[in-house]
Design a protein with these regions (language model features):
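Single conserved hydrophobic/aromatic residue that forms the stacking wall/gate
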Residues: 255-265
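Extended, highly charged
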Residues: 1-257
Length: 265
């Protein structure tokens, strides 16, 4: 946001704006006209109250903003870096060792860095999703949706996964996530246990792009985020779940999933 502000690419709206339809309509208009990102400083919730948390939309709504968010100067830069890591030109690096410094930097940035406390743990909010400025964008939508949720789970062996699944608010404490139950959820179901889930909002751009990237099995989303950001990704232990979550996420919602065989449990 500070970067966008400095480049006059952040529109601040300081009057109340409804999170139901109004905020989405404004953002939609800006997207279609190559407009700036928009920060709603007084998002109005469904009950008519003003949220204490602002709502940012259209942060990646232009080609140029997306490149700058990833620290890239052109579309193939990140792909070129990945190819260099997977298929290094050993002959070149032996002749010109300094050419291998970017590769070394990316390799050192891969392992995530464990820290004691995250930004999203400084304040603990009541268990009420309706107090968050989660938009309802279209008249035919089934409800209010978190559209860029960073969903953290782990498999039966403790390997973490970061994914993005549109999350629908059902009530004050329940979210609906669209995912494949035969993966991590199935691992936990086979053990007769519910799966811990963290739904994180915000954080550095590399987290968002890592969560939506198709990655090989031997490269985790946290490692890829480190490569994208060119620095180790800080992660921290979730407060009430046995999960490592992004330490720089602004909000972290902690859940357990229902049984895939019986959603009422």
């Amino acid at each position: 946001m500070n970067h966008l502000d400095q480049r006059d690419e952040l529109l601040r709206i300081d009057r109340p704006v409804d999170v139901e339809y109004e905020a989405g309509a404004i953002a939609d208009l800006l997207v279609k006209n190559d407009g700036p990102a928009v920060l709603f400083e007084q998002p109005r919730l469904a009950d008519g109250t003003i949220s204490s948390i602002p709502l940012l939309m259209n942060a990646f709504g232009s080609h140029d903003r997306t490149l700058r968010a990833l620290g890239a100067s052109h579309e193939t830069e990140i792909g070129d870096r990945m190819v260099a890591m997977m298929k290094p030109d050993i002959g070149l690096y032996m002749r010109k060792p300094w050419k291998g410094l970017p590769l070394l930097r990316d390799a050192l940035a891969m392992p995530p860095k464990k820290v004691r406390k995250g930004k999203g743990q400084r304040v603990r909010l009541p268990n009420d999703l309706t107090k968050l400025p989660i938009p309802k964008t279209w008249p035919m939508d089934g409800g209010h949706f978190i559209t860029l949720p960073l969903v953290v789970t782990k498999d039966g062996d403790g390997e973490h996964n970061l994914g993005m699944y549109r999350a629908q608010v059902h009530n004050e404490t329940e979210l609906g996530l669209h995912w494949q139950i035969h993966k991590h959820a199935a691992d936990h179901a086979a053990k007769g246990e519910r799966m811990p889930v963290a739904v994180c909002i915000g954080g550095p751009p590399e987290l968002i792009f890592s969560a939506i990237s198709p990655l090989p099995d031997n490269l985790s989303e946290y490692q890829f985020a480190g490569i994208l950001g060119q620095k180790s990704l800080p992660i921290t232990k979730a407060l009430t779940q046995d999960l490592w979550v992004p330490a720089e996420a602004d909000i972290c919602l902690l859940y357990t999933s229902p049984s895939p065989r019986d959603p009422t449990k």
